[in-house]
Each structure stands twice: as structure tokens, then as C-alpha cells.
A protein has these predicted regions:
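Phosphate/pyrophosphate-binding loops at sites that engage ATP/ADP/AMP, CoA/4′-phosphopantetheine
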Residues: 64-80, 188-193, 288, 322-336, ...
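Beta-strand segments within the central parallel beta-sheet cores of soluble alpha/beta enzyme folds
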Residues: 76-86, 112-118, 142-147, 197-204, ...
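Active-site-proximal alpha-helical scaffold in enzymes
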Residues: 117-148, 178-218, 278-284, 394-414
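Short glycine/threonine-rich loop-to-helix capping motif typified by GTGT followed
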Residues: 89-97, 308-312, 344-367, 394-396, ...
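Conserved catalytic cysteine-centered active-site region
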Residues: 33, 89-145, 149-180, 240-270, ...
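Short, Lys/Arg-enriched N-terminal segments with co-localized hydrophobic residues
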Residues: 9-26
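Polyampholytic, low-complexity intrinsically disordered segments
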Residues: 204, 210-281
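Condensing-enzyme catalytic core mediating Claisen C-C bond formation in acyl metabolism
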Residues: 28-56, 163, 167, 171, ...
């Protein structure tokens, strides 16, 4: 290839890049909902490990709360379709086909019931499908939600089940979920100069929020856990380490063992059972059910590549794409978002996602957390619910449970964990499936 041919080749490539970038920007702006969609009711079960309950029990808990939350009342028979997220109950409890099972439970049959699967983002995908079904005008009212029952399996079995959400060969070579996010953390440390102390800041912040959430799986702060551990050791006649503060406790390898360096026990989310659901209606009929609907301002979805093709492990391509779509649809910018739930399956994930979503610049997320910017009383509260880390992570229920928190905050019903901002109008939820294979970002608005 001579110089002239090389020049023409490079010129053509530049034109393709410019055209593609322009098309992406324009398409994001054009992707508006043809009909506004509102959330008029929401419910969520308590998250945790429930040996005496099954999947239907916890979904009934969420569904009944949803019905009670509709200010002007609703007849379940008005629900025209069900979209239900579930990742792997076929593995965890040997039962698949959850759409019609839940449809029968709530008296919805013979109307349509569809199961969606996107690993940890399964129920967020259910909500996305429900939004589009309403926006198209095909339905006026749909129920969306998710569920998962994980506690009947051992930790090893749960790890095996969760590995189904990775590219087939990744788990076989040691890239379990903790392994992947351990590698992500080391890459982030190397690129930006962060360290394990900064991960501890995320953990401590989330554990401070969780005791304020009555539905959270873990309701103890790190200081509470430290004191409880000290009492337990003392009762057993074992010398108590001289922990000076929460970070001292988290540095102790006996109290906080390594899972996949630099991920330690308290950097990881738990095994959980739980369910969540929301009632969606067309914007034009929303006031028939409540005087204060919460509207879906924007929703985006992205997908990611297998780890072998990542050229940089310090960001998630799918998150950035989903955010671009949601911002384009809503006409909003990152600085318009007043608080957000993000997918903190591991502490490092929260740091990276708050950068990918545009809340902080790349490499600045860990500094923002250290400065207290993401605390409940900070300028950009993150994971007011306690996050996956403390609220719990019943995989198929997580996406809608994050939006339940955003809805609760925007309705002013979050109690002690209510974001202390005078005019709280816009919140968001970010949900990641697998090791970045599926991502959704949803923006809710109170008008």
C-alpha cells in the first residue's frame, strides 16, 4: 500500500468514526418514549436468607406492598401483562418458567407473563420491556418485577450458579466474580493510584446507610460489627485485637479475610433471597391512581464483551453506553442527577460506576468517596439503601429493588435515610449483569 492508498484508507476510517459518533449522538437524542410512563406503586420484600420461605412467599410480600402503595387503589385484574426478571432459579431451586407461576400466584392468568434474563440485570430488563410496552400504547398497565431464591444452596454451589453469567471459559481459568473484580481493582489501583484503604471507604459508607433501611439484609455498621466481634472473642476467652477504628478492623485478616485480592470479605455482597415489583401505567392515566406519580425520564441498555477483548479494565463499556442512551432519552446530564443507586456487587464496582455514569471524572471517584461526597448527606448520595453490599443481592430482584429505593426517595418516604435535599426530583439506578455483559441505567423523575 503506497502513501496515497494509506491516506485514503485513513481518511475513510476517520469518516466512519465521525459518522458513527454523530449517529450515536443523534440516535440517543431521537430515542424518546412515544408515550410517557409512570410508576404508581412499588413493593419490595425484605432481603436476606429465609429458610422457612420460598420464592412465592417473598414475591407475595413485595406484591402486597405494591398494592397497598397505590394511593387511590388498584384492582389487580387491571394489570394487562407481567414482565418478571429471574436469573437462575432453575439452578438454585430446580424450578424454571417463573412467569406463569407468579401470574397464577397473583391471579393474573391467562394474561401474558414473560420472564426476562440478564444475570444481575434481569429485573431491570423486565422494567425496560414494561416501559416500552406502555410507551408503545399496546398496554395501559403492566406489572414488572424480579425474584431470586439463593439461600438453599451452599456458598460453593451459589458460586457455581453465578458463574453461569460469565463467558464459558472465564470461570474455568479462575475468573470467578471475585476474581474478575479483584483484577479490575488492581488495574484501577495501578492506573489511578488508589489502594485498599479507598475500598474501605465505600464499605464503611454503605454499612452506615444500611441500618437505616428496614428491608436491608445487613443492618450493622462496620463499627457495630467490630464491637460485636470484640464481645464474641471476649466471651470465648480469646484476646481481643486493639482495633482503633473501622479501618483497623477491616485491615485485620482474621476479621476480614481475603477472597480474591484485593477483594476482602467486607468488599463483597452477600447471598440473598428476595423479590421486588413495580406497577407501570401510561402517563395520561397516572393521576387516576396517585396524585404524585414518579415518571420514567430515560432508560438505556448496553452490552459488553468477554474479558479476553477488554483493552482497559478500569471502566465498563456497557455502563457508558447505557448511560449515554438514558441521558439522550431524558435530555438530562449527569449533573442533573441528585442521587443514585449503583451496582456495587463489590466495593471497586461502585468506584468505577460512579465515574462511568459521569458523576465524577475517571480516576476521581475514589477521591469523592474519601471526601464524603457520596454519603447520605453529601452532594451526590450513592446507594442510600446500603447498596447490594448491605441491602442484599437476590440477583433477579436487584434491578427493580434499586428503582424501588429511588421511587421511595422521590416520594419522600425513605424515613431516616431520606436524602436531605429540599427539592429532590431526579434519581437514577444503575444495574450491571454478569461481568459487564448487560447493563441498564434508568432515570426517574418527580414532576
Amino acid at each position: 500500500m503506497d502513501f496515497g492508498e494509506k491516506f485514503q484508507f485513513i481518511k475513510a476510517k476517520i469518516h466512519v468514526i465521525i459518522r458513527y459518533s454523530y449517529r450515536r449522538d443523534e440516535m440517543a437524542k431521537r430515542r424518546k418514549l412515544g408515550r410517557g410512563v409512570a410508576i404508581v406503586g412499588a413493593g419490595m420484600s425484605k432481603f436476606g436468607m429465609f429458610p422457612d420461605k420460598d420464592t412465592k412467599d417473598v414475591f407475595a410480600e413485595a406484591f402486597n406492598e405494591m398494592l397497598a402503595s397505590v394511593d387511590k387503589g388498584v384492582d389487580p385484574k387491571e394489570i394487562e401483562a407481567l414482565y418478571l426478571g429471574n436469573f437462575s432459579n432453575d439452578f438454585f431451586v430446580h424450578q424454571s418458567h417463573w412467569g406463569p407461576i407468579i401470574s397464577d400466584l397473583i391471579g393474573h392468568t391467562p394474561k401474558p407473563a414473560t420472564r426476562t434474563e440478564g444475570a444481575c440485570a434481569s429485573s431491570a430488563l423486565a422494567l425496560r420491556e414494561g416501559v416500552f410496552a406502555i410507551a408503545s400504547g399496546f398496554y395501559d398497565m403492566v406489572l414488572v418485577g424480579g425474584l431470586e431464591e439463593m439461600s438453599k444452596r451452599t456458598t460453593e454451589e451459589v458460586a457455581e450458579g453465578l458463574a453461569l453469567a460469565t463467558v464459558p471459559y472465564e470461570g474455568r481459568v479462575g475468573f470467578t466474580f471475585p476474581g474478575v473484580f479483584g483484577a479490575v481493582a488492581t488495574a484501577y489501583f495501578a492506573k489511578y493510584g488508589a489502594n485498599r484503604e479507598h475500598l474501605m471507604n465505600v464499605t464503611i459508607k454503605s454499612h452506615n446507610n444500611a441500618p437505616l433501611n428496614p428491608k436491608a439484609q445487613f443492618k450493622l455498621s462496620i463499627r457495630d460489627l467490630m464491637n460485636a466481634k470484640a464481645k464474641s472473642l471476649e466471651k470465648k476467652g480469646i484476646p481481643v485485637p486493639e482495633w482503633q477504628d473501622e479501618k483497623d478492623f477491616l485491615r485485620d485478616l482474621k476479621a476480614n479475610p481475603v477472597v480474591a485480592w484485593p477483594m476482602h470479605l467486607y468488599d463483597c455482597c452477600p447471598i440473598s433471597d428476595g423479590a421486588s415489583c413495580m406497577l407501570l401505567v401510561g402517563e395520561d392515566i397516572a393521576k387516576n391512581f396517585t396524585d404524585e406519580p414518579i415518571y420514567v425520564a430515560g432508560i438505556g441498555q448496553g452490552s459488553g464483551r468477554g474479558l479476553h477483548s477488554w483493552d482497559d479494565m478500569t471502566y465498563f463499556e456497557a455502563t457508558r453506553y447505557a448511560a449515554e442512551e438514558a441521558y439522550g432519552m431524558s435530555g438530562l446530564k449527569p449533573e442533573d442527577i441528585q442521587f443514585s443507586e449503583v451496582h456495587d456487587c463489590f466495593s471497586i464496582a461502585e468506584l468505577i460506576h460512579i465515574e462511568d455514569l459521569g458523576f465524577f471524572k475517571p480516576g476521581e471517584g475514589y477521591k469523592a468517596v474519601e471526601e464524603g461526597q457520596t454519603r447520605l448527606d453529601g452532594p451526590m448520595p450513592i446507594n442510600t439503601s446500603g447498596g447490594l453490599k448491605c441491602k442484599g443481592h437476590p440477583v433477579g430482584a436487584t434491578g427493580v429493588s434499586q428503582l424501588y429505593e429511588v421511587w421511595t426517595q422521590l416520594k419522600g418516604k425513605a424515613g431516616e435515610r431520606q436524602v436531605p435535599k429540599k427539592d429532590l426530583r431526579i434519581g437514577a439506578a444503575h444495574n450491571l449483569g454478569g461481568t459487564g455483559g448487560t447493563c441498564t441505567f434508568t432515570i426517574l423523575e418527580r414532576r
